[in-house]
Protein backbone atom coordinates (compact mmCIF):
# COMPACT_ATOMS: atom_id res chain seq x y z
CA UNK A 1 0.00 0.00 0.00
CA UNK A 2 1.37 3.38 -0.89
CA UNK A 3 1.73 6.15 1.63
CA UNK A 4 0.84 9.72 0.74
CA UNK A 5 3.85 11.94 0.95
CA UNK A 6 3.85 14.76 3.46
CA UNK A 7 6.57 17.06 4.78
CA UNK A 8 9.12 15.24 6.89
CA UNK A 9 9.20 16.11 10.54
CA UNK A 10 12.88 15.94 11.13
CA UNK A 11 16.29 16.33 9.78
CA UNK A 12 16.23 14.03 6.79
CA UNK A 13 13.79 16.11 4.78
CA UNK A 14 15.35 19.42 5.66
CA UNK A 15 18.74 18.08 4.79
CA UNK A 16 17.75 17.14 1.26
CA UNK A 17 17.65 20.64 -0.28
CA UNK A 18 21.13 21.34 1.06
CA UNK A 19 22.63 18.19 -0.40
CA UNK A 20 20.62 16.87 -3.32
CA UNK A 21 18.59 18.71 -5.93
CA UNK A 22 15.15 17.10 -5.78
CA UNK A 23 14.88 17.27 -9.58
CA UNK A 24 17.74 14.81 -9.92
CA UNK A 25 16.63 11.16 -10.23
CA UNK A 26 17.40 9.23 -7.07
CA UNK A 27 18.86 6.32 -9.00
CA UNK A 28 21.25 8.40 -11.06
CA UNK A 29 24.27 7.26 -9.13
CA UNK A 30 26.94 9.44 -10.64
CA UNK A 31 24.86 12.60 -10.58
CA UNK A 32 23.92 11.89 -6.99
CA UNK A 33 27.56 11.67 -6.01
CA UNK A 34 28.23 15.04 -7.58
CA UNK A 35 25.29 16.59 -5.75
CA UNK A 36 26.22 15.14 -2.38
CA UNK A 37 29.30 16.89 -1.01
CA UNK A 38 31.49 15.47 1.70
CA UNK A 39 31.07 16.13 5.39
CA UNK A 40 31.65 19.66 6.64
CA UNK A 41 33.32 18.26 9.78
CA UNK A 42 36.27 15.97 9.17
CA UNK A 43 39.41 14.63 10.81
CA UNK A 44 40.05 14.81 14.54
CA UNK A 45 37.15 17.21 15.08
CA UNK A 46 34.79 14.65 13.55
CA UNK A 47 36.18 11.95 15.83
CA UNK A 48 35.56 14.11 18.91
CA UNK A 49 32.04 14.97 17.76
CA UNK A 50 31.23 11.28 17.19
CA UNK A 51 32.57 10.33 20.63
CA UNK A 52 30.55 13.07 22.31
CA UNK A 53 27.32 12.41 20.43
CA UNK A 54 27.48 8.63 20.76
CA UNK A 55 28.40 8.87 24.46
CA UNK A 56 25.08 10.64 25.05
CA UNK A 57 23.30 7.79 23.31
CA UNK A 58 25.21 5.23 25.38
CA UNK A 59 24.15 7.02 28.58
CA UNK A 60 20.53 6.94 27.46
CA UNK A 61 20.76 3.19 26.92
CA UNK A 62 22.52 2.67 30.25
CA UNK A 63 19.92 4.62 32.20
CA UNK A 64 17.12 2.55 30.72
CA UNK A 65 18.35 -0.51 32.63
CA UNK A 66 20.89 0.69 35.18
CA UNK A 67 18.39 0.29 38.03
CA UNK A 68 17.89 -3.42 37.28
CA UNK A 69 20.57 -4.38 39.80
CA UNK A 70 20.24 -1.51 42.28
CA UNK A 71 16.53 -1.64 43.10
CA UNK A 72 17.07 -3.55 46.35
CA UNK A 73 19.60 -1.12 47.91
CA UNK A 74 17.52 1.88 46.83
CA UNK A 75 14.36 0.40 48.34
CA UNK A 76 16.30 -0.55 51.46
CA UNK A 77 17.72 2.94 51.95
CA UNK A 78 14.28 4.54 51.69
CA UNK A 79 12.32 1.64 53.23
CA UNK A 80 9.97 1.78 50.23
CA UNK A 81 9.29 -1.58 48.63
CA UNK A 82 5.90 -1.23 46.96
CA UNK A 83 7.16 1.35 44.46
CA UNK A 84 10.11 -0.62 43.13
CA UNK A 85 8.55 -0.89 39.70
CA UNK A 86 8.67 2.88 39.29
CA UNK A 87 12.47 2.92 39.22
CA UNK A 88 12.47 1.31 35.79
CA UNK A 89 9.05 2.39 34.56
CA UNK A 90 9.54 6.06 35.49
CA UNK A 91 12.43 6.52 33.07
CA UNK A 92 10.66 4.90 30.14
CA UNK A 93 7.46 6.80 30.96
CA UNK A 94 9.28 10.12 30.65
CA UNK A 95 10.83 8.96 27.38
CA UNK A 96 7.58 7.83 25.78
CA UNK A 97 5.61 10.92 26.83
CA UNK A 98 8.21 13.32 25.42
CA UNK A 99 9.52 11.44 22.39
CA UNK A 100 6.61 12.47 20.15
CA UNK A 101 6.61 16.24 20.80
CA UNK A 102 10.41 16.33 20.77
CA UNK A 103 10.40 14.59 17.40
CA UNK A 104 8.29 17.45 16.08
CA UNK A 105 10.45 20.05 17.81
CA UNK A 106 13.60 18.76 16.09
CA UNK A 107 11.97 19.55 12.74
CA UNK A 108 11.72 23.29 13.43
CA UNK A 109 14.18 24.26 16.19
CA UNK A 110 17.97 24.48 16.01
CA UNK A 111 19.15 20.89 16.41
CA UNK A 112 22.29 21.71 18.37
CA UNK A 113 20.61 23.81 21.04
CA UNK A 114 17.61 21.54 21.40
CA UNK A 115 20.01 18.61 21.83
CA UNK A 116 21.92 20.55 24.49
CA UNK A 117 18.66 21.41 26.24
CA UNK A 118 17.72 17.73 26.37
CA UNK A 119 21.18 16.83 27.66
CA UNK A 120 20.73 19.40 30.43
CA UNK A 121 17.33 17.90 31.33
CA UNK A 122 18.89 14.45 31.48
CA UNK A 123 21.75 15.69 33.67
CA UNK A 124 19.35 17.51 36.01
CA UNK A 125 17.21 14.40 36.40
CA UNK A 126 20.32 12.29 37.06
CA UNK A 127 21.50 14.78 39.70
CA UNK A 128 18.13 14.58 41.44
CA UNK A 129 18.28 10.76 41.40
CA UNK A 130 21.80 10.73 42.83
CA UNK A 131 20.98 13.17 45.63
CA UNK A 132 17.40 11.98 46.19
CA UNK A 133 16.30 12.14 49.86
CA UNK A 134 13.24 9.93 49.24
CA UNK A 135 11.78 7.38 46.86
CA UNK A 136 9.36 9.98 45.48
CA UNK A 137 12.28 12.27 44.62
CA UNK A 138 14.15 9.54 42.78
CA UNK A 139 11.00 8.62 40.82
CA UNK A 140 10.57 12.25 39.75
CA UNK A 141 14.24 12.34 38.79
CA UNK A 142 13.87 9.18 36.72
CA UNK A 143 10.89 10.57 34.82
CA UNK A 144 12.70 13.87 34.18
CA UNK A 145 15.88 12.09 33.07
CA UNK A 146 13.82 9.87 30.76
CA UNK A 147 12.29 12.93 29.11
CA UNK A 148 15.73 14.40 28.49
CA UNK A 149 17.04 11.03 27.37
CA UNK A 150 14.37 10.75 24.68
CA UNK A 151 15.55 14.08 23.31
CA UNK A 152 19.16 12.88 23.41
CA UNK A 153 18.26 9.80 21.38
CA UNK A 154 16.32 11.79 18.80
CA UNK A 155 19.11 14.34 18.77
CA UNK A 156 21.57 11.57 17.94
CA UNK A 157 19.52 10.50 14.95
CA UNK A 158 19.08 14.08 13.75
CA UNK A 159 22.69 15.17 14.27
CA UNK A 160 24.13 12.09 12.62
CA UNK A 161 21.80 12.43 9.66
CA UNK A 162 22.58 16.13 9.18
CA UNK A 163 26.33 15.85 9.61
CA UNK A 164 26.94 12.76 7.45
CA UNK A 165 26.63 12.26 3.71
CA UNK A 166 23.71 10.23 2.28
CA UNK A 167 26.11 7.36 1.60
CA UNK A 168 27.35 7.35 5.22
CA UNK A 169 23.94 7.70 6.82
CA UNK A 170 22.91 4.00 6.97
CA UNK A 171 26.14 3.08 8.76
CA UNK A 172 25.95 5.88 11.32
CA UNK A 173 22.21 5.49 11.94
CA UNK A 174 22.87 1.78 12.51
CA UNK A 175 25.54 2.73 15.05
CA UNK A 176 22.99 4.82 16.93
CA UNK A 177 20.79 1.75 17.40
CA UNK A 178 23.73 -0.51 18.22
CA UNK A 179 25.18 1.83 20.85
CA UNK A 180 21.78 2.36 22.44
CA UNK A 181 21.18 -1.40 22.62
CA UNK A 182 24.67 -1.99 24.02
CA UNK A 183 24.00 0.61 26.70
CA UNK A 184 20.77 -1.16 27.63
CA UNK A 185 22.46 -4.49 28.23
CA UNK A 186 25.49 -3.00 30.01
CA UNK A 187 23.28 -1.02 32.41
CA UNK A 188 22.83 -3.80 35.00
CA UNK A 189 26.57 -4.53 35.02
CA UNK A 190 27.57 -0.93 35.68
CA UNK A 191 24.76 -0.40 38.18
CA UNK A 192 25.70 -3.57 40.03
CA UNK A 193 29.35 -2.53 40.16
CA UNK A 194 28.51 0.80 41.78
CA UNK A 195 26.00 -0.79 44.14
CA UNK A 196 28.58 -3.25 45.49
CA UNK A 197 31.32 -0.63 45.83
CA UNK A 198 31.92 2.06 48.43
CA UNK A 199 30.61 4.59 45.90
CA UNK A 200 27.06 3.18 46.43
CA UNK A 201 24.18 3.17 43.99
CA UNK A 202 24.07 6.98 43.88
CA UNK A 203 27.11 7.05 41.61
CA UNK A 204 25.15 5.10 39.02
CA UNK A 205 23.44 8.44 38.42
CA UNK A 206 26.31 10.80 39.20
CA UNK A 207 28.28 9.05 36.44
CA UNK A 208 26.05 10.83 33.92
CA UNK A 209 27.07 14.22 35.29
CA UNK A 210 30.77 13.38 35.01
CA UNK A 211 30.50 12.32 31.36
CA UNK A 212 28.23 15.27 30.57
CA UNK A 213 30.79 17.64 32.09
CA UNK A 214 33.68 16.13 30.14
CA UNK A 215 31.81 16.22 26.83
CA UNK A 216 30.20 19.65 27.27
CA UNK A 217 33.04 21.63 25.61
CA UNK A 218 32.66 19.46 22.50
CA UNK A 219 28.90 19.98 22.42
CA UNK A 220 29.22 23.74 22.85
CA UNK A 221 32.28 24.58 20.76
CA UNK A 222 32.68 21.83 18.13
CA UNK A 223 29.06 21.14 17.19
CA UNK A 224 27.88 23.75 14.68
CA UNK A 225 24.60 25.57 15.04
CA UNK A 226 22.03 23.71 12.93
CA UNK A 227 18.85 25.75 12.37
CA UNK A 228 16.11 23.87 10.55
CA UNK A 229 14.89 25.25 7.21
CA UNK A 230 11.32 24.29 8.15
CA UNK A 231 11.48 26.75 11.03
CA UNK A 232 13.01 29.69 9.18
CA UNK A 233 11.15 33.00 9.17
CA UNK A 234 9.19 32.21 12.32
CA UNK A 235 9.76 33.37 15.86
CA UNK A 236 10.45 31.02 18.74
CA UNK A 237 6.92 31.45 20.12
CA UNK A 238 5.36 30.96 16.69
CA UNK A 239 7.13 27.62 16.44
CA UNK A 240 5.91 26.64 19.91
CA UNK A 241 2.31 27.44 19.00
CA UNK A 242 2.49 25.24 15.91
CA UNK A 243 3.30 22.12 17.94
CA UNK A 244 0.45 19.67 18.51
CA UNK A 245 -0.34 20.58 22.12
CA UNK A 246 -3.73 18.85 22.16
CA UNK A 247 -2.12 15.59 21.07
CA UNK A 248 0.77 16.08 23.50
CA UNK A 249 -1.50 16.53 26.53
CA UNK A 250 -3.74 13.62 25.56
CA UNK A 251 -0.73 11.37 24.86
CA UNK A 252 0.82 12.21 28.23
CA UNK A 253 -2.43 11.61 30.09
CA UNK A 254 -3.05 8.35 28.22
CA UNK A 255 0.37 6.87 28.99
CA UNK A 256 0.44 8.06 32.61
CA UNK A 257 -3.02 6.70 33.43
CA UNK A 258 -2.28 3.34 31.78
CA UNK A 259 0.97 2.94 33.71
CA UNK A 260 -0.61 4.00 37.02
CA UNK A 261 -3.32 1.39 36.45
CA UNK A 262 -0.79 -1.38 35.75
CA UNK A 263 1.84 -0.51 38.39
CA UNK A 264 -0.48 0.31 41.30
CA UNK A 265 -2.92 -2.53 40.66
CA UNK A 266 -2.31 -5.47 42.97
CA UNK A 267 0.54 -3.69 44.80
CA UNK A 268 -0.57 -0.31 46.15
CA UNK A 269 -4.24 -1.34 46.01
CA UNK A 270 -6.29 -4.28 44.72
CA UNK A 271 -7.24 -4.63 41.07
CA UNK A 272 -10.92 -4.15 41.98
CA UNK A 273 -10.29 -1.01 44.03
CA UNK A 274 -12.37 1.98 42.94
CA UNK A 275 -9.23 4.01 42.26
CA UNK A 276 -7.90 1.37 39.91
CA UNK A 277 -11.21 1.11 38.08
CA UNK A 278 -11.23 4.90 37.73
CA UNK A 279 -7.74 4.82 36.22
CA UNK A 280 -8.84 2.13 33.78
CA UNK A 281 -11.80 4.24 32.64
CA UNK A 282 -9.69 7.41 32.38
CA UNK A 283 -7.00 5.63 30.35
CA UNK A 284 -9.62 4.24 27.94
CA UNK A 285 -11.26 7.65 27.48
CA UNK A 286 -7.92 9.40 26.92
CA UNK A 287 -6.80 6.73 24.44
CA UNK A 288 -9.96 7.20 22.39
CA UNK A 289 -9.60 10.99 22.60
CA UNK A 290 -5.97 10.80 21.44
CA UNK A 291 -6.84 8.59 18.46
CA UNK A 292 -9.65 10.95 17.44
CA UNK A 293 -7.43 14.03 17.85
CA UNK A 294 -4.86 12.52 15.51
CA UNK A 295 -7.36 11.20 12.97
CA UNK A 296 -9.29 14.47 12.69
CA UNK A 297 -6.21 16.69 13.32
CA UNK A 298 -7.91 18.53 16.18
CA UNK A 299 -5.97 21.67 17.05
CA UNK A 300 -3.28 20.82 14.51
CA UNK A 301 -2.68 19.94 10.86
CA UNK A 302 -1.87 16.67 9.12
CA UNK A 303 1.73 17.79 8.77
CA UNK A 304 2.08 18.85 12.42
CA UNK A 305 0.09 16.14 14.19
CA UNK A 306 1.95 14.15 16.78
CA UNK A 307 1.61 10.55 15.56
CA UNK A 308 2.30 9.47 11.94
CA UNK A 309 -0.81 7.30 11.92
CA UNK A 310 -0.85 6.81 8.16
CA UNK A 311 1.91 4.21 8.58
CA UNK A 312 -0.59 2.01 10.39
CA UNK A 313 -2.39 1.58 7.07
CA UNK A 314 0.73 0.17 5.44
CA UNK A 315 0.95 -3.60 6.16
CA UNK A 316 4.75 -3.79 6.08
CA UNK A 317 5.23 -0.76 8.33
CA UNK A 318 2.63 -2.09 10.76
CA UNK A 319 4.40 -5.46 10.89
CA UNK A 320 7.76 -3.78 11.52
CA UNK A 321 6.15 -1.74 14.30
CA UNK A 322 4.78 -4.91 15.94
CA UNK A 323 8.13 -6.68 15.60
CA UNK A 324 9.95 -3.68 17.07
CA UNK A 325 7.56 -3.66 20.02
CA UNK A 326 7.87 -7.41 20.66
CA UNK A 327 11.66 -7.25 20.57
CA UNK A 328 11.81 -4.30 22.96
CA UNK A 329 9.54 -5.96 25.52
CA UNK A 330 11.45 -9.27 25.47
CA UNK A 331 14.82 -7.50 25.69
CA UNK A 332 13.89 -5.69 28.89
CA UNK A 333 12.45 -8.82 30.50
CA UNK A 334 15.77 -10.61 29.97
CA UNK A 335 17.94 -7.70 31.10
CA UNK A 336 15.96 -7.14 34.31
CA UNK A 337 15.03 -10.67 35.38
CA UNK A 338 18.05 -12.84 34.52
CA UNK A 339 20.23 -11.00 37.10
CA UNK A 340 17.34 -11.04 39.58
CA UNK A 341 17.13 -14.84 39.34
CA UNK A 342 20.81 -15.23 40.21
CA UNK A 343 20.55 -12.76 43.09
CA UNK A 344 17.79 -14.77 44.71
CA UNK A 345 18.80 -18.35 43.90
CA UNK A 346 22.59 -18.10 44.17
CA UNK A 347 22.85 -15.11 46.52
CA UNK A 348 24.92 -13.19 43.98
CA UNK A 349 25.97 -9.61 44.55
CA UNK A 350 24.79 -6.95 42.13
CA UNK A 351 27.96 -7.06 40.03
CA UNK A 352 28.17 -10.87 40.01
CA UNK A 353 24.55 -11.28 38.94
CA UNK A 354 25.14 -8.76 36.15
CA UNK A 355 28.28 -10.62 35.06
CA UNK A 356 26.11 -13.70 34.60
CA UNK A 357 24.27 -11.69 31.95
CA UNK A 358 27.42 -11.57 29.82
CA UNK A 359 26.59 -14.62 27.64
CA UNK A 360 23.38 -12.87 26.65
CA UNK A 361 25.26 -9.58 26.16
CA UNK A 362 28.03 -11.06 24.01
CA UNK A 363 25.72 -12.92 21.64
CA UNK A 364 23.38 -9.94 21.43
CA UNK A 365 26.17 -7.57 20.38
CA UNK A 366 27.78 -10.09 18.02
CA UNK A 367 24.57 -10.91 16.19
CA UNK A 368 23.51 -7.26 15.95
CA UNK A 369 26.84 -6.48 14.27
CA UNK A 370 26.55 -9.52 11.99
CA UNK A 371 22.99 -8.60 11.04
CA UNK A 372 23.95 -5.00 10.31
CA UNK A 373 26.74 -6.13 7.99
CA UNK A 374 25.22 -9.16 6.25
CA UNK A 375 21.49 -8.41 6.03
CA UNK A 376 21.84 -5.44 3.62
CA UNK A 377 23.98 -7.64 1.36
CA UNK A 378 21.42 -10.45 1.24
CA UNK A 379 18.45 -8.12 1.00
CA UNK A 380 15.92 -10.72 2.17
CA UNK A 381 15.17 -9.33 5.61
CA UNK A 382 12.25 -11.74 6.20
CA UNK A 383 14.73 -14.59 6.77
CA UNK A 384 16.59 -12.64 9.45
CA UNK A 385 13.40 -11.59 11.20
CA UNK A 386 11.97 -15.10 11.17
CA UNK A 387 15.14 -16.70 12.55
CA UNK A 388 15.37 -14.00 15.19
CA UNK A 389 11.76 -14.60 16.27
CA UNK A 390 12.24 -18.37 16.47
CA UNK A 391 15.31 -18.00 18.70
CA UNK A 392 13.49 -15.48 20.88
CA UNK A 393 10.51 -17.78 21.30
CA UNK A 394 12.62 -20.86 22.09
CA UNK A 395 14.80 -18.92 24.54
CA UNK A 396 11.78 -17.45 26.34
CA UNK A 397 10.09 -20.86 26.62
CA UNK A 398 13.26 -22.36 28.09
CA UNK A 399 13.65 -19.45 30.54
CA UNK A 400 10.08 -20.13 31.66
CA UNK A 401 11.11 -23.69 32.60
CA UNK A 402 13.96 -22.53 34.87
CA UNK A 403 13.52 -23.80 38.43
CA UNK A 404 15.32 -23.43 41.73
CA UNK A 405 17.70 -26.31 40.95
CA UNK A 406 18.40 -25.42 37.30
CA UNK A 407 22.15 -25.29 36.71
CA UNK A 408 23.73 -21.91 35.84
CA UNK A 409 25.13 -23.36 32.61
CA UNK A 410 21.61 -24.17 31.43
CA UNK A 411 20.46 -20.64 32.23
CA UNK A 412 23.44 -19.28 30.28
CA UNK A 413 22.46 -21.40 27.29
CA UNK A 414 18.84 -20.27 27.43
CA UNK A 415 19.92 -16.63 27.71
CA UNK A 416 22.18 -17.06 24.66
CA UNK A 417 19.16 -18.22 22.66
CA UNK A 418 17.30 -15.10 23.78
CA UNK A 419 20.32 -13.03 22.80
CA UNK A 420 20.22 -14.57 19.33
CA UNK A 421 16.54 -13.67 19.27
CA UNK A 422 17.44 -9.99 19.63
CA UNK A 423 19.36 -10.01 16.32
CA UNK A 424 16.84 -7.84 14.46
CA UNK A 425 15.61 -5.65 17.33
CA UNK A 426 17.37 -2.63 15.78
CA UNK A 427 17.08 -3.70 12.14
CA UNK A 428 13.88 -1.74 11.51
CA UNK A 429 15.93 1.46 11.55
CA UNK A 430 17.55 0.22 8.34
CA UNK A 431 14.66 -1.74 6.82
CA UNK A 432 11.97 0.90 7.36
CA UNK A 433 13.74 3.72 5.51
CA UNK A 434 14.49 1.31 2.65
CA UNK A 435 10.81 0.65 1.96
CA UNK A 436 9.35 4.15 2.26
CA UNK A 437 9.76 7.10 -0.06
CA UNK A 438 12.76 9.33 0.71
CA UNK A 439 10.62 12.18 2.02
CA UNK A 440 9.06 9.87 4.66
CA UNK A 441 12.27 8.50 6.14
CA UNK A 442 12.30 10.83 9.15
CA UNK A 443 8.69 9.99 9.99
CA UNK A 444 9.52 6.30 9.58
CA UNK A 445 12.33 6.56 12.14
CA UNK A 446 10.02 8.36 14.56
CA UNK A 447 7.38 5.66 14.02
CA UNK A 448 9.92 2.98 14.97
CA UNK A 449 11.04 5.00 17.99
CA UNK A 450 7.46 5.07 19.25
CA UNK A 451 7.11 1.30 18.89
CA UNK A 452 10.36 0.69 20.73
CA UNK A 453 9.59 3.12 23.54
CA UNK A 454 6.02 2.02 24.14
CA UNK A 455 6.98 -1.65 24.23
CA UNK A 456 9.69 -1.01 26.79
CA UNK A 457 7.33 1.05 28.93
CA UNK A 458 4.47 -1.45 28.87
CA UNK A 459 6.82 -4.43 29.06
CA UNK A 460 8.52 -3.16 32.21
CA UNK A 461 5.23 -2.14 33.81
CA UNK A 462 3.52 -5.46 33.11
CA UNK A 463 6.59 -7.50 34.15
CA UNK A 464 6.89 -5.55 37.40
CA UNK A 465 3.18 -5.96 38.11
CA UNK A 466 3.33 -9.72 37.48
CA UNK A 467 6.42 -10.26 39.61
CA UNK A 468 5.42 -8.08 42.56
CA UNK A 469 1.78 -9.17 42.67
CA UNK A 470 2.47 -12.91 42.45
CA UNK A 471 5.47 -12.80 44.78
CA UNK A 472 3.69 -10.73 47.42
CA UNK A 473 0.62 -12.96 47.36
CA UNK A 474 2.70 -16.15 47.40
CA UNK A 475 5.00 -15.05 50.24
CA UNK A 476 2.08 -13.68 52.24
CA UNK A 477 0.32 -17.05 51.99
CA UNK A 478 3.55 -18.82 52.98
CA UNK A 479 4.82 -16.52 55.75
CA UNK A 480 1.87 -14.38 56.82
CA UNK A 481 0.78 -16.75 59.62
CA UNK A 482 4.32 -17.35 60.88
CA UNK A 483 4.89 -14.01 62.58
CA UNK A 484 6.42 -12.08 59.69
CA UNK A 485 5.11 -8.59 59.02
CA UNK A 486 3.96 -7.28 55.65
CA UNK A 487 6.95 -4.92 55.59
CA UNK A 488 9.29 -7.90 56.03
CA UNK A 489 7.59 -9.72 53.17
CA UNK A 490 7.76 -6.65 50.93
CA UNK A 491 11.47 -6.31 51.65
CA UNK A 492 11.98 -9.91 50.52
CA UNK A 493 10.47 -9.02 47.15
CA UNK A 494 13.09 -6.28 46.78
CA UNK A 495 16.09 -8.57 46.98
CA UNK A 496 17.57 -11.82 48.20
CA UNK A 497 19.79 -10.02 50.71
CA UNK A 498 16.82 -8.75 52.74
CA UNK A 499 16.90 -9.43 56.47
CA UNK A 500 13.88 -11.71 56.14
CA UNK A 501 15.55 -14.01 53.61
CA UNK A 502 18.68 -14.15 55.75
CA UNK A 503 16.89 -15.25 58.91
CA UNK A 504 14.41 -17.71 57.43
CA UNK A 505 14.95 -21.38 58.41
CA UNK A 506 16.43 -23.42 55.52
CA UNK A 507 13.21 -25.27 54.67
CA UNK A 508 11.13 -22.10 54.75
CA UNK A 509 13.74 -20.20 52.75
CA UNK A 510 13.66 -22.88 50.05
CA UNK A 511 9.88 -22.66 49.89
CA UNK A 512 10.07 -18.86 49.66
CA UNK A 513 12.63 -19.06 46.86
CA UNK A 514 10.38 -21.45 44.94
CA UNK A 515 7.61 -18.86 45.13
CA UNK A 516 9.96 -16.15 43.85
CA UNK A 517 11.40 -18.28 41.03
CA UNK A 518 7.87 -19.25 39.98
CA UNK A 519 6.98 -15.55 39.80
CA UNK A 520 10.05 -14.84 37.66
CA UNK A 521 9.02 -17.70 35.36
CA UNK A 522 5.58 -16.15 34.99
CA UNK A 523 7.20 -12.93 33.79
CA UNK A 524 8.60 -14.88 30.84
CA UNK A 525 5.05 -15.67 29.70
CA UNK A 526 5.04 -12.12 28.35
CA UNK A 527 8.34 -12.78 26.54
CA UNK A 528 6.89 -16.02 25.13
CA UNK A 529 3.86 -14.11 23.85
CA UNK A 530 6.14 -11.47 22.35
CA UNK A 531 8.27 -14.15 20.68
CA UNK A 532 5.23 -15.91 19.22
CA UNK A 533 3.83 -12.66 17.84
CA UNK A 534 7.31 -11.84 16.50
CA UNK A 535 7.34 -15.12 14.52
CA UNK A 536 3.83 -14.61 13.15
CA UNK A 537 4.56 -11.02 12.11
CA UNK A 538 7.84 -12.10 10.50
CA UNK A 539 6.05 -14.73 8.41
CA UNK A 540 3.74 -12.02 7.05
CA UNK A 541 6.55 -9.73 5.90
CA UNK A 542 6.92 -9.33 2.12
CA UNK A 543 9.14 -11.90 0.45
CA UNK A 544 11.27 -9.53 -1.57
CA UNK A 545 14.65 -7.85 -1.52
CA UNK A 546 15.03 -4.33 -0.20
UniProtKB/Swiss-Prot annotation:
It is a multi-pass membrane protein. It is found in: Vacuole membrane; Cell membrane. Residues 16-29 have a biased composition (Basic and acidic residues). One of its GO terms (molecular function) is transmembrane transporter activity. Its main location: membrane. Residues 1-29 are annotated as: Disordered. MFS-type transporter; part of the gene cluster that mediates the biosynthesis of patulin, an acetate-derived tetraketide mycotoxin produced by several fungal species that shows antimicrobial properties against several bacteria. May be involved in the secretion of E-ascladiol to be converted to patulin by the secreted patulin synthase patE. Belongs to the major facilitator superfamily. TCR/Tet family. This is MFS-type transporter patC.
Amino acid sequence: MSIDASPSESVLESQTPDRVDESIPIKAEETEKDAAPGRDIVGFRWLLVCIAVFSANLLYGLDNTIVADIQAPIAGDFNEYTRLGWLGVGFTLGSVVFILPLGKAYAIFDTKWLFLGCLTMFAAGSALCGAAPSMNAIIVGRVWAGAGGAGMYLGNLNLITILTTPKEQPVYVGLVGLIYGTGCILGPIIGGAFSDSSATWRWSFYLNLVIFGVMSPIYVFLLPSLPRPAGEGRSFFKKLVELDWVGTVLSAGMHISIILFIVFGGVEWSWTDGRNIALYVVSAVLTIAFVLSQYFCIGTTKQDRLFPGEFLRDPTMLLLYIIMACGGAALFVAVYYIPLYFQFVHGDSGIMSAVRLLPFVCFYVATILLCGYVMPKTGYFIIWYLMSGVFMLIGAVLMYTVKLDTSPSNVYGYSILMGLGMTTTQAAYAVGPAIVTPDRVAECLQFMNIGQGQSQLLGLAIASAIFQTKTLSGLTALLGDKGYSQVDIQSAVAGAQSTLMERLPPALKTAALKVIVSSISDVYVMAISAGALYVVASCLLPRRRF
